[in-house]
């Protein structure tokens, strides 16, 4: 059995249990090989082991039954014991309730007795207190203070309490009978008050917070309590302003006081507010006045910079102080302090700002024109000048000489950046220093100054000068600088628009001034665009005029009707070469001067005029067969030049012109077929006829019959 018990090892696994049994049986395992294996011995061992297991099972079963009986017996005993405990607990709970009721009854009696005792004791205490006060009053009446409380400096707290009460009593006494004693009490009241304040001062210098708290609590009922607070505030600031930055010093001071004032005074928020008021009205106000008054009349630029910087730093300090407990309406309190410092400077701020901005802008412009040795001329306006301008635009008559600008656009990006920078700073100061109700109006005033000096005095003047510098369309070898003006004006417009959106819009976005500013901006831009359009139109006229001069000078009648038809080199003419070179140069200049759709619009207009010029130019000549081939070569080159425009409509016009030129060389019998071709079918017959009439063989070949 012992052997069987040893086989039951934890954790029990049946397979392992069989393996261990087989291994322990001689001849039952794999030791010794197949020859040593004895199945009968193994079977016998298994049978014996099963019998042992059955015996073990019976023994364990008997033991389990015995334990179950014992467990049931103990459970019955435990249940009986629990019932007994419940009964005793109920008895104890009843005793507890009785005791609680008795305690409540006794407590009620005690409270009643206490009220009775208090009713007796309070008058007695008052009587004792009154007796003491009468005793002390008699000492003042006799003129000799004998009590220890008045002579012992260590009992100053008790003396203060007594004298404060005597002082209140003395105020109720008639002056004619008790004037002397009232005077003595008042004198002692004042002496004790001074002693307490001196004690508070000494404790503050020693850093004894607990002593300061005790003295402040005693002084709270004295008239000199406010003086105690003043002393505290004054001593707090001793040695507090040692750095170069008074605003940083003030912030550190207030933060330090905020941490300790609650440990000293019963009303810390009032004391801290008084300290902050003292810092603002005395220290900061004198510093601000010193910084601003010295440059207020002599240097407007420095004055505005200092005002903006000081106001910003003051408001930043105020924002930090908002974290402290200063009472219920600390926002209003701090705003009033800031206003008290800066009100005299903010009242006329916008006048100083606009005055400085005007003078500064005028100086920037004048300095630029002086650097160019240019005296600004008066641009004529009114009826006569407008009439001349309209006549010149429509007829190109030389109504007075054009101005030679020597290639100068009189536009400077540096000047523009300086003007915008000055205006940007003005907008920033305006945002910070203007009252919210005045902000949109003040911002609009700054914007009008920007419009006056940037848009009118600089850009508009440059456009007018550029317009006056455009030569008439019949001028030869004219230098066309207006496109440079266009290029620079476009760049400046972008900068102007960016500042409008970035710096002006946030200031006026929620006010009626928004629509006013947008309208003014729209009017300015429309006015500028109209002058740009006028200048571009006249510049294009000059370009076409220059092409006319080239064609008139270089194109010969013999180009298209050579004397020797058999000795002609088929290529484009010299006039075509020079015109195409000129056109390509102008196209490149236009692309560099403009952006976006403006390039396409101007190139389309130039392309249409270029086509009209070549069309009319070809109408002036008579063409032989070989001359017609030369004309086709020229138009092919013109068409190649038109491709550089990258405008489909212009290319289509030259494609059609090229097809028309084919009418100059086509065989008479095929003429009708060509006229009805895809490219020419939609053209008016008169146009086709006019081109056919240019052929040298028009009469001899009787070509008119095709159009009858």
From Swiss-Prot:
A cellular-component GO term for this protein: cytoplasm
N-acetylalanine PTM sites in chain numbering: 2
Residues bearing the modification Phosphoserine: 412
Database matches in InterPro entries: Sec10-like, Sec10_HB, Sec10_N
Subcellular location per the Swiss-Prot or TrEMBL entry: Cytoplasm; Midbody
Protein name: Exocyst complex component 5
Main location, first listed in the record: cytoplasm
Record-listed Phosphothreonine modification sites: 122, 395, 405
BP GO terms, sorted: epithelial cell apoptotic process; establishment of planar polarity; exocytosis; Golgi to plasma membrane transport; membrane fission; mitotic cytokinesis; non-motile cilium assembly; post-Golgi vesicle-mediated transport
Assembly: The exocyst complex is composed of EXOC1, EXOC2, EXOC3, EXOC4, EXOC5, EXOC6, EXOC7 and EXOC8. Interacts with EXOC3L1.
Ribonucleoprotein as UniProt keyword: no
Source organism superkingdom: Eukaryota
Expression across tissues: Ubiquitous.
Protein family (similarity comment): Belongs to the SEC10 family.
Sorted UniProt keywords: Acetylation, Coiled coil, Cytoplasm, Exocytosis, Phosphoprotein, Protein transport, Transport
Organism taxonomic ancestry: Eukaryota, Metazoa, Chordata, Craniata, Vertebrata
Native source organism of the sequence: Homo sapiens (Human)
GO function term, MF aspect, one: small GTPase binding
Annotated coiled-coil segments of the chain: 40-101
Function: Component of the exocyst complex involved in the docking of exocytic vesicles with fusion sites on the plasma membrane.
């Amino acid at each position: 059995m012992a052997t069987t018990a040893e086989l039951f090892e934890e954790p029990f696994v049946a397979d392992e249990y069989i393996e261990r049994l087989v291994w322990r049986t001689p001849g039952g395992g794999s030791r010794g090989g197949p020859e040593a294996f004895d199945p009968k011995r193994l079977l016998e061992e298994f049978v014996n082991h099963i019998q042992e297991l059955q015996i073990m099972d019976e023994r364990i079963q008997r033991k389990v039954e015995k334990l179950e009986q014992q467990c049931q017996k103990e459970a019955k005993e435990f249940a009986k014991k629990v019932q007994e405990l419940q009964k005793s607990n109920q008895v104890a709970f009843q005793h507890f309730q009785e005791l609680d009721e008795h305690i409540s009854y006794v407590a009620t009696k005690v409270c009643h007795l206490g009220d009775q005792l208090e009713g007796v004791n309070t008058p007695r205490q008052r009587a004792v207190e009154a007796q003491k006060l009468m005793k002390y009053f008699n000492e003042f009446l006799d003129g000799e203070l004998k009590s220890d409380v008045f002579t012992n400096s260590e009992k100053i707290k008790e003396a203060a309490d007594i004298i404060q009460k005597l002082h209140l009593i003395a105020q109720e006494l008639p002056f004619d009978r008790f004037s002397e004693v009232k005077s003595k009490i008042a004198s002692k009241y004042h002496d004790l008050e001074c002693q307490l304040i001196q004690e508070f001062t000494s404790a503050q210098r020693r850093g004894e917070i607990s002593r300061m708290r005790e003295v402040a609590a005693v002084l709270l009922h004295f008239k000199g309590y406010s003086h105690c607070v003043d002393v505290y505030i004054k001593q707090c600031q001793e040695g507090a302003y040692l750095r170069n930055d008074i605003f940083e010093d003030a912030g550190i001071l207030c933060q330090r006081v905020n941490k300790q004032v609650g440990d000293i005074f019963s009303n810390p928020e009032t004391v801290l507010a008084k300290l902050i008021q003292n810092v603002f009205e005395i220290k900061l106000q004198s510093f601000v006045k010193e910084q601003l008054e010295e440059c207020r009349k002599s240097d407007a630029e420095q004055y505005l910079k200092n005002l903006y910087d000081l106001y910003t730093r003051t408001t930043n300090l105020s924002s930090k102080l908002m974290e402290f407990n200063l009472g219920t309406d600390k926002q209003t309190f701090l705003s009033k302090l800031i206003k008290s410092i800066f009100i005299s400077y903010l009242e006329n701020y916008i006048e100083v700002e606009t005055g400085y901005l005007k003078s500064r802008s005028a100086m920037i412009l004048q300095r630029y024109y002086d650097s160019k040795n240019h005296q600004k001329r008066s641009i004529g306006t009114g009826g006569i000048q407008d009439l001349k301008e309209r006549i010149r635009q429509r007829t190109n008559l030389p109504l007075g000489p054009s101005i030679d600008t020597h290639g100068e656009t009189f536009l400077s990006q540096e000047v523009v950046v300086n003007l915008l920078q000055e205006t940007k700073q003005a907008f920033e100061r305006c945002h910070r220093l203007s009252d919210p109700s005045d902000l949109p109006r003040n911002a609009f005033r700054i914007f009008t100054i920007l419009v006056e000096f940037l848009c009118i005095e600089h850009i508009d003047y440059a456009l007018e000068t550029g317009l006056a510098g455009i030569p008439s369309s019949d001028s030869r070898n004219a230098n066309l600088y207006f496109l440079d003006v266009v290029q620079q004006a476009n760049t400046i417009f972008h900068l102007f628009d960016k500042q409008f959106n970035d710096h002006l819009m946030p200031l006026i976005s929620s006010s009626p001034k928004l629509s006013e500013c947008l309208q003014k901006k729209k009017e300015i831009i429309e006015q500028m665009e109209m002058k740009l359009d006028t200048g571009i139109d006249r510049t294009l006229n000059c370009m076409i005029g220059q092409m006319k001069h080239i064609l008139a000078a270089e194109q010969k009648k013999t180009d298209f009707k050579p004397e020797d038809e058999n000795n002609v080199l088929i290529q484009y003419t010299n006039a075509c070469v020079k015109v195409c070179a000129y056109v390509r140069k102008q196209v490149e200049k236009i692309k560099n001067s403009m952006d976006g759709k403006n390039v396409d619009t101007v190139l389309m207009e130039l392309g249409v005029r270029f086509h009209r010029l070549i069309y009319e130019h070809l109408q002036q000549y008579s063409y032989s067969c070989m001359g017609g081939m030369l004309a086709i070569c020229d138009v092919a080159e013109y068409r190649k030049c038109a491709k550089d425009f990258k405008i489909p409509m212009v290319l289509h016009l030259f494609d059609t012109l090229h097809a028309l030129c084919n009418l100059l060389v086509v065989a008479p019998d095929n003429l009708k077929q060509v006229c009805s071709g895809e490219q020419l079918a939609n053209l008016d017959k008169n146009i086709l006829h006019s081109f056919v009439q240019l052929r040298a063989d028009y009469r001899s070949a009787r070509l008119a019959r095709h159009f009858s």
